[in-house]
């Protein structure tokens, strides 16, 4: 259990939140069970059904509610600064695309700029796929901030979920499922509140699943285009997990079209779009890695010891120059891999992975709805999705690490099961009214938890979500703000303490070092002199930063940012004579 219940995932304060939702859910269920049935006018009602029948308008409302609803919550739940290695990697790709580049040349003295999840050779670029950074770049280009791109992708994901569910459920239940996703995922999960990913995977998965159902029923050419777009989004966001969902669905769709003897006009648009997208993807990969391989595979070959799958072999050919890289890749990242090498350890890891997904997608409020796997299996048109999820789960448990944004590709299937469970309660109420009470108690608990999360649970947990808490780099927001506010150009050499925690990354730069206001570089002394680095940027003010670590107590008054005096404990001018002394020594 210690492999997943640790710093990046659940943490003790979220056990408290788990207890809160458990008690709220039990209280709501008990209240509605004991209350007279005639007073339970909650859901569904005729007005909601009538509006949901306008399917395009329903999807549009979900999109607008996801986007502008999150904006309206900013005074209470503000966006937080990036803190995770993955986020900085995505931001690098977004910055690159915003400035019209596919990748960047390797900077001189590149060892000083090594970061996690970033390729330095043969080019300087993120290891992740291009789908999410493209959305972020769109937001950055149009509004100046990639946050808008995240909001846009999350709103599209919620709307696509509504569109997908409309192909399998009555319109009112599809709309209800999308609204649940808006509250649980768009507004209060790290999918919509960080740069860590998840929204594009939901979008791609829902497009594939929704288009497959429509192709099986009507076989319209535009549905093939939607499916091709979804496949490309999955390939460029979560390629392995996307393949687990896409392969069974694609085989099923092709089989149905052959049985129906679909004309060429049905196949051609989607096939052509898929081929064009594959060519573009291959070209991007070749520009980044020099080969037709995904950047993440090249990154693993260069930087990772732990294999991505529990049955793989470790990569012992990697050499690390810095201690934080070694500690992370050798000690931390390999923990679940080592644990899964025994049958009992593999079983424990599988259970822990399942618990984590339950914490994110279901939680106590929707646990009763998991009974929906039975009607999903019985329904002819949705049975294939349950088989697809079962197939994907075999692949999920074989991955060394499994987080919620990995499983996001299957969010549409998960919500279909949950909605089928709620719908089954509504239908079963004809025989036993207690099911109607449980249905309305479940929905009421979600409404109550919205207000609990908004006003009761502290808003300083990053990211604000139902399941996990991630790193909060001590002093990062304030020190970076101080440096960005200084006039002129600056070079900050970061010297980590011996007790440095690898999760606190300060070496985060943009697409072009020369044009940056502040460059963040690693201190390589005593193994390698910093003199060449200082001499490479003669027009910059050079600083030495020894950042705070875990256990650091921030200033008492957190309503005001640090001033220069508060930061001076960690940030000092670098000896200005170092470059000249180094030059004299060479002579």
Protein language model regions, located:
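Perimembrane helix-loop-helix junctions
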Residues: 222, 243-283
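Catalytic lumenal/periplasmic loop and adjoining terminal transmembrane helix
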Residues: 286, 423-584
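Transmembrane-helix signature of polytopic, membrane-embedded enzymes
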Residues: 60-62, 161-185, 199-203, 217-226, ...
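Signature aromatic-anchored transmembrane alpha helix within multi-pass, membrane-resident enzymes
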Residues: 58-64, 246, 250, 271-275, ...
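Hydrophobic, aromatic-rich transmembrane alpha-helices
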Residues: 156-159, 250-260, 341-386, 391-393
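Hydrophobic/aromatic-rich transmembrane helices and adjacent perimembrane loops
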Residues: 90-91, 198, 237, 243, ...
């Amino acid at each position: 259990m210690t492999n997943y219940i640790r710093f990046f995932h659940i943490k003790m304060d979220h056990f408290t939140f788990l207890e809160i939702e458990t008690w709220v859910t039990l209280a709501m269920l008990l209240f509605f069970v004991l209350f007279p049935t005639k007073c339970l006018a909650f859901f569904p009602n005729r007005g909601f059904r009538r509006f949901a029948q306008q399917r395009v308008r329903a999807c549009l409302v979900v999109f607008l509610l996801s986007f502008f609803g999150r904006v309206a919550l900013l005074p209470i739940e503000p966006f937080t600064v990036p803190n995770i290695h993955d986020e900085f990697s995505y931001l690098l790709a977004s910055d690159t695309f915003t400035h019209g580049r596919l990748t960047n040349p390797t900077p001189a003295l590149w060892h000083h700029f090594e970061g996690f999840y970033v390729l330095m050779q043969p080019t300087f670029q993120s290891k992740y796929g291009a789908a999410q950074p493209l959305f972020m770049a769109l937001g950055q280009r149009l509004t100046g901030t990639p946050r808008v791109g995240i909001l846009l992708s999350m709103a599209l994901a919620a709307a696509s979920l509504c569109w997908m569910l409309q192909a399998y459920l009555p319109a009112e239940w599809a709309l209800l499922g999308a609204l649940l996703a808006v509250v649980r995922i768009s507004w209060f999960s790290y999918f919509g509140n960080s740069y860590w990913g998840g929204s594009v995977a939901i979008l791609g998965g829902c497009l594939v699943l929704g288009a497959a159902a429509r192709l099986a029923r009507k076989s319209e050419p535009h549905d093939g285009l939607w499916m091709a777009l979804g496949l490309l989004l999955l390939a460029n966001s979560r390629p392995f997990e996307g393949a687990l969902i896409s392969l069974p669905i694609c085989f099923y769709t092709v089989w149905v079209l052959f049985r129906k003897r679909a004309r060429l006009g049905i196949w051609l648009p989607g096939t052509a779009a898929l081929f064009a997208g594959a060519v573009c993807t291959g070209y991007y990969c070749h520009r980044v890695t020099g080969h037709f391989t995904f950047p993440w595979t090249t990154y693993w070959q260069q930087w990772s010891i732990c294999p991505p799958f529990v049955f793989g072999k470790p990569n012992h050919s990697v050499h690390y120059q810095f201690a934080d890289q070694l500690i992370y890749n050798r000690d931390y990242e390999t923990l679940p891999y080592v644990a899964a090498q025994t049958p009992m350890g593999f079983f424990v890891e599988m259970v822990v992975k399942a618990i984590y997904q339950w914490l994110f997608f279901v939680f106590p409020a929707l646990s009763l709805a998991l009974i929906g796997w039975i009607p999903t299996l019985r329904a002819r048109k949705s049975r294939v999705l349950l088989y697809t999820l079962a197939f994907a789960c075999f692949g999920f448990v074989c991955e060394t690490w499994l987080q919620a944004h990995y499983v996001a590709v299957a969010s549409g299937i998960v919500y279909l099961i949950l909605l089928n469970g709620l719908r089954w309660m509504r239908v079963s109420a004809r025989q036993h009214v207690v099911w109607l009470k449980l249905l309305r108690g479940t929905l009421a608990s979600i409404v109550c938890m919205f207000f609990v999360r908004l006003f009761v649970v502290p808003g300083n947990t990053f990211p604000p979500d139902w399941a996990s808490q991630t790193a909060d780099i001590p002093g990062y927001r304030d020190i970076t703000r101080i440096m960005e506010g200084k006039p002129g150009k600056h070079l900050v050499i970061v010297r980590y303490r011996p007790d440095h925690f690898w999760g606190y990354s300060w070496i985060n730069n943009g697409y072009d070092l020369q044009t940056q206001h502040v460059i963040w570089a690693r201190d390589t002394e005593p193994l390698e002199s910093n003199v060449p680095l200082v001499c490479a940027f003669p027009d910059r003010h050079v600083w030495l930063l020894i950042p705070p670590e875990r256990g650091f107590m921030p200033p008492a008054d957190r309503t005001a940012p640090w001033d220069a005096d508060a930061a001076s404990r960690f940030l000092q001018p670098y000896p200005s004579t170092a470059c000249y002394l180094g030059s004299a020594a060479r002579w």
